[in-house]
């Protein structure tokens, strides 16, 4: 999996 994409998804969930 793409770590950058995963981190982006995490950011979207927290924002």
Curated annotation (Swiss-Prot):
The reply to whether Glycoprotein figures as a keyword in the UniProt entry is yes
Coiled-coil annotated residue ranges, if any:
none
Q: Does the keyword Glycoprotein apply?
A: yes
Q: Which GO terms describe its molecular function?
A: carbohydrate binding
Q: Where are the transmembrane segments?
A: none
**Induction conditions:** Hemagglutinating activity is inhibited by polygalacturonic acid.
Enumerate the UniProt keywords alphabetically: Glycoprotein, Hemagglutinin, Lectin
* Residues glycosylated per entry: 2
Say what the protein does. Trypsin-stable lectin with hemagglutinating activity. Has mitogenic activity on murine splenocytes. Inhibits HIV-reverse transcriptase.
- Which family does this protein fall into? Belongs to the leguminous lectin family.
The record's note on quaternary structure and interaction partners says: Heterodimer of a 29 kDa and a 31 kDa subunit.
Task: Quote the protein name from its UniProt record.
Answer: Lectin 31 kDa subunit
